[in-house]
Amino acid sequence: MYMLTFEPGLCVAGIIRQVRSNPFMHVVQAYARTTETYREDIEMTKSMLKLKADEPLLVMSIVAAAMDFQTMVMAPIEMEASEFLYGFYAERMSYIVTNRGMSELHEYIQLQCQRHLLVKVEIDGQYLVQEHEYEAQGFNIKRVKELITDVATWVPKKVKGMIGWSVDAVLDSFQEYFYKVITERIPMAMKVCSWVATVWDQIKTWIEDAMTAMSSFLQGCNELLTWGLATLAACCALNVLERILIFMEFLDESIDIAGIFLRTGVVAAACYHFSSTAKGFTEMMSVLSVATTAVAAVVCANYFGGSKTKKVNAQGNPVDLLERIAAGLSSISQDSLVSLGKSCSAINSIATSYGHLRNFAGRVLTMLRDFAWKILGLETRFLADAALVFGEDVDGWLQRISALREAYVSKAYSSQDEVFEMNVLLERGYKMRHLMATGSRVSPAIGNMLMQGLADLERLHRNAAVQGVKGVRKIPFTVFAHGNSRCGKSLLIGKLISDFQEHKGLGEDTVYSRNTTETHWSGYRRQPIVVIDDFAAVESDISAEAQLINLVSSTPYSVVMAAIEEKGMTFDSQFIFASTNFLEVSPNGKIRCDDAFRNRRHVLIDVKLKPEVEYQSDDFTANQSYNILEHSHGRYNVVATFDNYEELLAYCLTKHEQHEAEQEANLAKLRRTNKFESHFKKFEQVLQLSTYFSSSIERIKREALATTDGADDYHLLYVVPRNGSYLHVAANKDFQIQQWYGPVEEVAEEDILRASERMLLGAYEFLLLSTELNVVVKNHLPELICTDNYDHNLEFCGVVGDPVYHQQLLKNIRALKPWHRAVLFGIGTLMGAKNPTPWYKRMWEGIKDVLYKAYSTEISQWPVPLKITCGIVLVGIVGAGFWKTVSVLTNAGNGAGLVGAAVNSFSVVSTAEAQSRKPNRFEVQQYRYKNVPLTRRSWGNAQMSLDQSTVSILNKCHAKFIIASQHAQIVLVPGRRFIGYSHFFCNLKHPLMVQIETADRTYFHRYQPENMEYIEDSELCVYHSSCLEDISHSCWDLFCWDPDKELPKKFSADFVSCKYNTWTKSVEPTWANVDAEVIKEDFTICDGEYRNTVSTSIRYEAPTVMSDCGSMIITNVGGKTKIVGIHVAGRDNKIGMASLLPPLLPCAQAQGAEKYFNFYPIEYDAAEGIARVGELKPKLYIPLPKKTSLVKTPEEWHLGTPCDKVPSILVKGDPRLADTVHADYDPCLSGLTKYSTPMSPLDSVLLGETCQEILDEWFDCLPEGFELGEVTINEALNGVDGVDYMDRIPLATSEGFPHVMSREQGEKGKQRFVQGDGHIVSLIPGTSVHEAYETLSRTIATEVPTLVGIECPKDEKLPFRKVFTKPKTRNFTILPMEYNILVRQYFLNFVRFIMKKRDVLPCQVGINPYSMEWSIVASRLKSQGNDILCCDYSSFDGLLSKQIMEMMADMINRFCGGGTLICAKRKNLLMACCSRLAISRDSVWRIECGIPSGFPLTVICNSIFNEILVRYHYKLLLQEHNAPNMYVQSFKNLISMVTYGDDNLISVNAVVKPYFDGTKLKQAMARNGIIITDGKDKTSATLEFRRLEDCDFLKRGFLKRSSVLWDAPEEKASLWAQLHYVNVNNCEMQVAYMTNLVNVLRELYMHDPTEMVEFRRLALKSIPWLNTTDLPTLYQVKEFYAEQRLRNIPDHNDSLDMLTSVDLLGPAILGEGVPQEALVLSELLEVRDLRYHTVPDNDNGKEVWILFNTMYPQKLLPSNCHSFTWNCGQGRGGLPTQHWLATNVTRTDSKLNKLIRTAVAANKKIVLATKDNILPINVIAVLLAARNKVMPSLATNALLTYVIGAAKKLNFLTSECQFAFFNV
């Protein structure tokens, strides 16, 4: 097969040689014989068959197509002959021949031949027949083509024939012929477009403006600017002319007038002037082709077709011109110094430049310079100079030096920022000096100017650096790197400094290395960066910490200098970098407030080494990881973690930007009012400096003043050169001056002049700040320091302003004293102020003539192609007027607006602009764009709607993606995502440091290309990263995610954009109203080589331009303003196109959140784990406890015991904290802080191994046949009778959010959402809980739901220190009822397994401390020895990360099994609890870590988490210390461990103690942000091994009774608190106290039986109402423990109250044996058991049913049924509390008694019913019968007396219910 080869720069002969070769012609012949196209998008028409039949024409067209294809090649391409013919050629010919006709083919062949062969090809007349000739209002398209042809053929002839080349001659000739042709050929055009007559006048104006833009530098290159601007402007004018003619229907379609002119006229002119036989002809023409192609792509509309899909160009702007030229040159010359690519890749490759357009142009000129030398052998000084001047922005550099000089003259000092800028300018100067020394030679004039500017800048910097400013300053930005020795923190600091220097443009000598042990700051010269290595490693008289206090401050601080002339130097460096081994202040640091030191470290980096990564000498950061620490709440918290250096650098740069903005805001007002103080209080202090500089000065003074009276009182002030000699000036303390002229010894000259600089600066500072110098003089300092204005005797002889003005100032000038004039003249000499002309202008004026002559001579000898190309590049830099015109025209649309814009743009008539603008209603909004008006575009034709939501959307969702100088618009989406456009982001193939600028702030981000998802059949792409800052999830509703359903086919929309203007350096929010339409039709987006075909788009008529991509299309959808699309491309400069939003899924949100919450636009109080995102809507209220249920008992009940506990703080403003520093303590808010800092990520491999080991142990102890699947909702609600650990769901607790919002007075808990008989309940259909349960059941199958929890302060007893010293109330989280039910369904069996197998597993949930289980735990721990770690965690609830929770979910799924659906549900349920919303009073918070305390699996998950942490760090430590691998894999054999939530005990075998102990474990966990302390002594700084007898677990100790028996005594401090405070929620105080006292006696028995007996006696003696039978005896307690140890009575609640057992009622009333189904007390009163009877469905009119303690909702019962519920009183045998009995039974008018009497009166049977246990109901029935006279008191007395005889504890009935015993 024959291959065609195309490559950049390939000559025409090479192309023809290939296409005329025999092998290729064989393929052509085969192609001519075929009648198939083999392409779906190409149709074989009659015209195509006619072309194939004519062999000569076919061959000519193939040659033309090959030459055309060659011009598009940017890199070498090999193509099969058949691929070329059936592909490119067939596509091109099909479009030309089929759509345009044979005449168009003729013109195509002629154009290609004329362009490449420079010959005019004549074709037989048969082909000139016009198949399609379009006429429009008498305007013939053929005549337009003839016009362009005439212009194209005239230009080269005219240029060739010109003698005495001049710019004016060319422009005049162009103008003359251009008008002549238009007048003769198209007379209508001049009438339609009269502005054509002024085009060339406007071009001349643009050239003059461009010359002015660069002052003297461009004086000699006006020829280049003429070529460039003439080319660009002519193309622009012709293009506008064509668009207007089409609009006015003089043309039916575009014929690309400007393109034809550009490709023929300009190129042909260059060819005629540059011989084809000249050296480098082919290459030079390729360069010109690159330039003209770029012009066509940027300035002209690009029309191209040929396929069924429409191709659209991605939007471009003037910067694109230079990008395209750079890309073309790179492809032509592979040896270019830099390789500049397309789009943002090109910008990124020069990211080290200063982000200016001139820098980019300088690089392009460098490529042209290299090209001219290598190809043409032409060494051009102009291109070398231009590359330097533009590439390094020499002009701007000189202007800034001039501004700094003038600022110094006006103030006599340089500020902190000015010195910083001097350092930046010095570095740029040094780089330019290096370029001149190593690169191409520049002109001597340019070189000398740069060297002079650098010398002046060095002098200015030297003078300012030794001065210091006694005024307010910015607080320096401090970065501390902390870590262990040999972790590379010093290297890290060095690398950070280097990168900060590069980022800020600073040089290497801008760092001062400070030794804190030295008193003096020797060598300090106001360097912007100070580095302190090994901070505080060595003690000093003034500690390093103490020194830092004054350095990091905004107040002036004078540093101690050794030299007297440097006294008064103040510190004002802007950066401090330090490395240290210490986190805290040294005990000898003499710092009285540690926080003052801590707060001065703005970035504190904790440097760690990655154990799995080897050290790399070429990249020491490869094995480092970084934790960012912040000190808060008494500890260091990890606020960010980075695994690579680039992300750390981005974080530091962002923090510095924030710090800098804060400092600017803080000091703005202070700087306005601040007054600079001189370092010299008296003039004699200035004079005394001379004695310290040089011995030569003193000798000169003595010799010169030998004859002067009082010579010893004079001090030499300065010596400066003047008129070939040296002027000497001396002064005394009385301001008297002596001056003389004389020589200076050569050996002392430099020394004397340098000393004079310092003294002059001091004198000038003293003078300028002196009260003697009047304000008028200060305002004219430039003239007064001009040395030309002083005569030989230093008398002022100049003129200030015009003569009249000077006369007004003459009195003030004459008032100047001699020492004033002497100092002003001296400082003028020092600053080089020889005349009033500004320094910057003098620099250029000095070389103006030299450059003009050199450049004009050199450029005249260049080949024309090089002139045109360079001219085009120069216009890209300085053609501001032209580009402004282009911007106006491209934004003017295609209608009447374009006509008006063309008239204004190309006319030289002055226009007036109103100096007031239309008020913008959006300026009153508090958005980022408040002070930047949202302006309507020139082509917008409607007023913006009154709805402010459009601006709100812009503020919330718009952002800019900034890479170097490129600003791309992006759209932020909730879930840490943004939407971009593919033709931009596809070029970013490597990680990059970028900036994200939102409406609120700008931050650095490390862009990771792998996180970008490109959407199929869309031009949009979606980027996601956890490092992106999220936006409010309420913004989700601002997007139209379902356009097929919501969006109409046609609609009116707002085109909203916020672009960065590279010219004004500002943000420009703009909008326009567009009429949009959804089009389902293929269109292709083109951007260079990029192609993407999309089937659906939003289209609108709008002349959009480059950088519009990313703009939002916003319209009203369903009554709400939403984003419906994102702009991605434009076509024909009149059609805009947007892509519909990609099909994204929302992040899981809590159902109904928007109904109850007002979400903030941004998050507040954000930390790593939490952020405040909203608040409850007005008038909504979450009921929380406001007062404690704990009641203080009388003093005598305390029995002399101490108590250090009080009830916790439940509300803000607790009166106990009034008038204290904690008066504003908020317990709800404080409880959230534990979630602020989750633990760091763990190594995934090691974590996986750890979890697998735990999972294997679960399987090892799994009983055969044990059920692990999910349970039914009935079992989840009611539990399973007879099965341990399968208890029912507690119904008295809160129902959670949002159900609590519907709670009415008197209602509480979950009971109101269930129905049943009290034992078997079910959800009531139709309630909010039932509906939420159904919804959540479906949701968890596919996604992680977002829960809403209520943070509720915990009502408990706390130590005094946690209430008064440092308040700390614990919160528990109330989760929704439906979530708790589902968790029970899917995890109840797993929980049952964990609790049941606690004898072999570490988790001890369910342990009975009174039983033998405690002894078993002790035995397990002792099996490894007696070295035990007793551990406690800090803020354990907030540590758990999503990484750990996901691992636990996977473990449980693998263990419990089930299908994919069940596993997904389990995992989503678990993941939901560590990513939720929390309501704290009226605030709504987002929490992204930890386990809520109200989670049903909290204690189980925490126990497993506890075990994972210990086992993970065990393996980690043993691996780090190279322990035998057998030890690493033998945790179970070498470690015994028990856990209960965050409590643990770890018994360590002696063989692994060298590798695993408390110190190593504490340090290893701290590396991951986990703080673990000694569980016994929480204040201890160490974690040491303890004996088992010294440990505690669950606040219980280990007391050995025998070799096998261990007791678990509770801490006495907890026991005594039970006697001081009791909970009276469900019983009376006496009953509650007695219950607590019994528990205390039991616990004391485990401490010492004797102590228990004595305490019992004390209680009976001190409390009169106690009976001996109320308290258990020693033997009863002993028997209790015996039963517990035999496991006769399991204890599920850690305590057993036998007095609450209903069995105490015995068989009374029903007699001996099994209870019966019913008890008939009388004909009208009966008690029934609902196990055997059912509640009636309707009212039969004969019975009244009273149900007790069932769950039947009253509203669902028939009218004759009534439901009552009571709480059982403790010690009352299942009977209700005394309060309930008194309220409902004793009180005669209670509702219950009224029901009884009403039924009796109606002769209805009264049925009292309950389920299961009717014994208490029997007693209540007797009491009700007595109270309502249903039974006589004699009968009720007998019954109750019998009952009390069997259960003597019920004796309280005789006193509480006397009516049942006596007739009262």
Curated annotation (Swiss-Prot):
Pfam families: Peptidase_C3, RdRP_1, RNA_helicase. The record marks 315-316, 915-916, 943-944, 1151-1152 as: Cleavage. GO terms for biological process: DNA-templated transcription; proteolysis; viral RNA genome replication. The active site is at residues 983, 1019, 1109. It comes from the Viruses. Residues 1426-1556 form the RdRp catalytic domain. Keywords: ATP-binding, Covalent protein-RNA linkage, Helicase, Host cytoplasm, Host endoplasmic reticulum, Host membrane, Hydrolase, Membrane, Nucleotide-binding, Nucleotidyltransferase, Phosphoprotein, Protease, RNA-directed RNA polymerase, Thiol protease, Transferase, Transmembrane, Transmembrane helix, Viral RNA replication. This is RNA1 polyprotein. It comes from Red clover mottle virus (RCMV).
